């Protein structure tokens, strides 16, 4: 359908139509049924895929997200096995064939669009994305960085923060743009550096926060709570706020054969 948070309003006085089962059931007066389509994402990775696994695990716990494609920049990345175990289609790009970054991104865009991905989620992806991808998914390419941007950019952020002796570091989720590690920030979570922390224990703490924060942000996006203004600043509406309600109220045609919906009931006055 291409729309998120689509609402099916059912105006029967005493019954509603169960969109999943095609069966009628008692329906309290003045109640409306909301059908929310899952957010379809493509995940890019280069390594073990622990953040991919965290997302997969949270979808089993009700996160309204569907991973429709995984693309790896390395054929030996363990994240490929995680995707296959979850039944997710996987592509591994051959660096010899796609040595040119723009050619690689053009192929990635083709595969993600064919899979129906609405957002691109970088999860330990070690290649910089090009304008080819950014233009195909404007403000829809997410990146996870293991530090509080704009501090400690680059591939060794945790080690750099530890070496600098900071007392607080953290995790940032941001939209990617053409400036490396500098796109609009969606969310940040601080991590305190304890006196007895080693680099290894700090890495463990950072990764634990990553695995919680990334799915949470995806849940915000799926609920229609995230927007980017003209100045490039990200705003997250309160849960159930106006932005989320407007998104949920967007009318659409619901095809029950797709089977990718989260059902919620909202009590209110039918108009």
Language-model features and meaning:
Residues 23-28:
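Short, low-complexity intrinsically disordered segments enriched in A/P/G/S/L with frequent Arg
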Residues 35-78, 82:
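N-terminal Rossmann-like dinucleotide-binding module
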Residues 58, 65, 73, 123-235:
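Donor/substrate-binding cores of folate-linked one-carbon enzymes
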Residues 63-107:
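Short, surface-exposed acidic-centric catalytic microdomains
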Residues 120:
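Structured binding elements
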């Amino acid at each position: 359908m291409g729309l998120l948070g689509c609402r099916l309003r059912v105006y029967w006085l005493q019954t509603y139509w169960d969109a999943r089962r095609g069966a009628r059931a008692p329906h309290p007066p003045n109640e409306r049924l909301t059908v929310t389509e899952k957010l379809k994402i493509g995940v890019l990775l280069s390594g073990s895929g622990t953040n991919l696994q965290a997302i997969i695990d949270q979808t089993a716990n009700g996160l309204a997200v569907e991973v429709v494609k995984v693309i790896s920049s390395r054929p030996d990345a363990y994240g490929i096995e995680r995707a296959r175990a979850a039944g997710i289609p996987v592509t591994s790009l051959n660096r010899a064939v796609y040595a040119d970054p723009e050619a690689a991104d053009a192929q990635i865009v083709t595969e993600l669009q064919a899979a129906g991905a609405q957002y691109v989620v970088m999860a330990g992806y070690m290649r910089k994305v090009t304008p080819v991808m950014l233009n195909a998914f404007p403000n829809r390419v997410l990146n996870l960085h293991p530090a509080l941007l704009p501090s400690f950019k680059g591939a060794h952020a945790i080690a750099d923060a530890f070496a600098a002796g900071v007392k607080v570091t953290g995790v940032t989720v941001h939209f990617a743009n053409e400036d490396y590690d500098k796109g609009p920030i969606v969310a940040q979570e601080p991590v305190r550096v304890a006196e007895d922390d080693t680099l290894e224990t700090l890495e463990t703490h950072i990764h634990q926060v990553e695995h919680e924060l990334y799915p949470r942000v995806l849940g915000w996006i799926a609920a229609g709570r995230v927007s980017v203004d003209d100045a490039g600043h990200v705003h997250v509406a309160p849960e159930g706020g106006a932005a989320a309600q407007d998104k949920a109220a967007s009318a659409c045609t619901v095809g029950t054969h797709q089977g990718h919906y989260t059902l919620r009931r909202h009590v209110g006055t039918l108009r």
